[in-house]
Amino acid sequence: MSNGKITQVIGPVIDVEFEAGELPEIYYALKVSNPSLGDEPWNLVAEVAQHLGENTVRAIAMDSTDGLVRGQEVLNTGRQISVPVGRGTLGRILNVIGEPVDEQGPVETDTTWEIHRPTPEFVDQSTKVEAFETGIKVVDLLAPYARGGKIGLFGGAGVGKTVLIMELIHNIAKKHGGFSVFAGVGERTREGNDLWNEMKESNVLDKTALVYGQMNEPPGARARVALSALTVAEYFRDQENQDVLLFVDNIFRFTQAGSEVSALLGRIPSAVGYQPTLSTEMGELQERITTTKHGSITSVQAIYVPADDLTDPAPATTFAHLDATTVLSRQIAELGIYPAVDPLDSSSRILDPQVLGEEHYQVARDVQYVLQRYKDLQDIIAILGMDELSEEDKQTVSRARKIQRFLSQPFHVAEIFTGTPGKYVELSETIRGFKEIVEGKHDSVPEQAFYMAGGIDEVLENAAKMAS
């Protein structure tokens, strides 16, 4: 294979000319020496995105292009970007091209996989449906997660998406003991650092591989880092027959990075300035996240909602792929109820008596009915006051306010902020607690006793303390 020469540099995009008949294929990795990144030769990787004609390809750089000059030599590696996979990646932080960035030495593994891989064949996919317990009351009761499913955490800025993800990692590592892969896509470097330190302190780091392409990285890295992390997860699923958890924070940044490079690649923007290939790119990523006969990948994806607008093309395209949605609401966060999950807006495909059993389904529907009735009555209460309600409606409002407070829960990962020890609530306890509230067994208990409690027994202890 002959080497090429740089003919043009436009921000994160570089054009490279090769000799006739020597063009690298789409997605092949090219390497070039960038003195601004260090003295090592071939230290910048770029991925071929387009063939422009006249023996020229356009490639997206995975790191800074500052310092590149026209006429510089470019190496065709003859293969795609490949990342190390296997147990050697656990406890490590990798970047988009699979290099360790935690200063802990090289990754101890001999196997590397290319990051663009085919979707599992239809015959290899599993069709079994079962719920996946998280230990978080509002999730397990009202919008349960499916094993091997795709879950979206929707919310604007600062309502608690990252904290909820960290709590899930904590609960799953402690209770489930499986491997997790965390993809930090275009989020804050500080959060990435905090996550690593907290995982280390809570002893879950040795079960987790972290792959980061943070906010300060060029769009090429942010657009590909989710694929690198998914490849690490696929190895555990296909070769080690594991049930893997893949956390993506934040899937919106994957779309955003794609839109940043799309215009530079000469594509005409689509609605709201997004790339015309938005649904294709999203589909290629999401379809690889699935359960096969070997194992499963359950993915939890934080989805930033620009300006709290759920109809924006980025969140709307992601919706189509999800099995469950956990919607975080600013109104609920303002009430001081955390996790700020909206119990009426969040949904799940498996909220079905045939999957969960009749009792769980009935309690969930009863809780939703009480909360919806309270929501309907709020206009009347605001205009006329509580006194104008019928006795039955007053009772509904009282129960709804207790349910609302009982849906809050202290998190393990937030102990350092709140000083309250975190609680993992078993599903059977969650169902029992809400069933008793809906049936009116705790109508005499003050609503403040339900706030930030674990199970219903703790609520009764709180009430006894308040009474004494």
From Swiss-Prot:
Q: Which Gene3D superfamilies match?
A: 2.40.10.170, Bovine Mitochondrial F1-atpase, Atp Synthase Beta Chain, Chain D, domain 3, P-loop containing nucleotide triphosphate hydrolases
Q: Name one Pfam family in it.
A: ATP-synt_VA_C
Q: Which membrane topology term applies here?
A: Peripheral membrane protein
* EC code(s) of this entry: 7.1.2.2
Where does this one sit in the cell?
Cell inner membrane
Q: Which GO terms describe its cellular component?
A: plasma membrane; proton-transporting ATP synthase complex
A Gene Ontology molecular function term of the record = ATP hydrolysis activity
What keywords tag this UniProt record?
ATP synthesis, ATP-binding, Cell inner membrane, Cell membrane, CF(1), Hydrogen ion transport, Ion transport, Membrane, Nucleotide-binding, Translocase, Transport
Kindly give the InterPro entries that the UniProt entry links to this protein. Answer: AAA+_ATPase, ATP-synt_VA_C, ATP_synth_F1_bsu, ATPase_a/bsu_AS, ATPase_alpha/beta_chains, ATPase_F1/V1/A1_a/bsu_N, ATPase_F1/V1/A1_a/bsu_N_sf, ATPase_F1/V1/A1_a/bsu_nucl-bd
Q: Which family does it belong to?
A: Belongs to the ATPase alpha/beta chains family.
Describe the subunit structure.
F-type ATPases have 2 components, CF(1) - the catalytic core - and CF(0) - the membrane proton channel. CF(1) has five subunits: alpha(3), beta(3), gamma(1), delta(1), epsilon(1). CF(0) has three main subunits: a(1), b(2) and c(9-12). The alpha and beta chains form an alternating ring which encloses part of the gamma chain. CF(1) is attached to CF(0) by a central stalk formed by the gamma and epsilon chains, while a peripheral stalk is formed by the delta and b chains.
Q: Quote the HAMAP family the UniProt record gives.
A: ATP_synth_beta_bact (MF_01347)
Q: What is the documented function of this protein?
A: Produces ATP from ADP in the presence of a proton gradient across the membrane. The catalytic sites are hosted primarily by the beta subunits.
What protein name is recorded for this chain?
ATP synthase subunit beta 3
Q: Which organism is it from?
A: Syntrophotalea carbinolica (strain DSM 2380 / NBRC 103641 / GraBd1) (Pelobacter carbinolicus)
